Amino acid sequence: ICKRNLDIERPSYTNLNRLISQVVSSITASLRFDGALNVDLTEFQTNLVPYPRIHFPLVTYAPIISAEKAYHEQLAVAEVTSACFEPANQMVKCDPRHGKYMACCMLYRGDVVPKDVNAAIATIKTKRSIQFVDWCPTGFKVGINYQPPTVVLGGDLAKVQRAVCMLSNTTAVAEAWARLDHKFDLMYAKRAFVHWYVGEGMEEGEFSEAREDLAALEKDYEEVGLDTFEAEEEEGGDEY
């Protein structure tokens, strides 16, 4: 994101932290400022977590515009909302088009009115590329905060009038677990760095246990994404 959107050749931890801080600021804004629809942190858990194990939200933030390329025309609510469903604006590398959404939490900041938000979400629901699971209603939790995003003076990000941070629970995040598993398997096959952990008091069995747990988590996400509605129809046949 830093390279593509902000034209930073070699992003440092400062660049990354400034981007992450915008996300954290958006999530906690409702605790600090007034808005039309304030969202409590406990509401995230209620709305985003359908099962205890499926509790890893995918975070997306828009717009991410460099200070040098700051638009004179501000992006509309519909545009920033649509940008939240683009893989390019995600904080975790995975393709939501290959998965299904279980729930979405949209946190708007700045010059935003509920009417525009409702229209933008209605448009999103009509898009074929954005799929929701069929065993729960297509829930969009919305938070609107009147405080516009604040940026660090002389920083990489442009000052914008409105922004949105989306927390979504999608089965596509399992791609991140698969990547992690693959990297672990390559290193663990050679027992790379294991001696350091064992030397500090860990047991080798803990690595195998953690690997099995992550494999089970991948399976859980896979099962959640299955078309339960279709499966029930096939089982039931023509019975009413």
From Swiss-Prot:
The record marks Y240 as: Involved in polymerization. This is Tubulin alpha chain. It comes from Octopus vulgaris (Common octopus). GO terms for biological process: microtubule-based process. It catalyses: GTP + H2O = GDP + phosphate + H(+). GO terms for cellular component: cytoplasm; microtubule. Its main location: cytoplasm. Signal peptide: none annotated. Dimer of alpha and beta chains. A typical microtubule is a hollow water-filled tube with an outer diameter of 25 nm and an inner diameter of 15 nM. Alpha-beta heterodimers associate head-to-tail to form protofilaments running lengthwise along the microtubule wall with the beta-tubulin subunit facing the microtubule plus end conferring a structural polarity. Microtubules usually have 13 protofilaments but different protofilament numbers can be found in some organisms and specialized cells. InterPro entries: Alpha_tubulin, Tub_FtsZ_C, Tubulin, Tubulin/FtsZ-like_C, Tubulin/FtsZ_2-layer-sand-dom, Tubulin/FtsZ_GTPase_sf, Tubulin_C. Its cofactor is Mg(2+). The active site is at E43. GO terms for molecular function: GTP binding; hydrolase activity; structural constituent of cytoskeleton. Undergoes a tyrosination/detyrosination cycle, the cyclic removal and re-addition of a C-terminal tyrosine residue by the enzymes tubulin tyrosine carboxypeptidase (TTCP) and tubulin tyrosine ligase (TTL), respectively. Its EC number is 3.6.5.-.
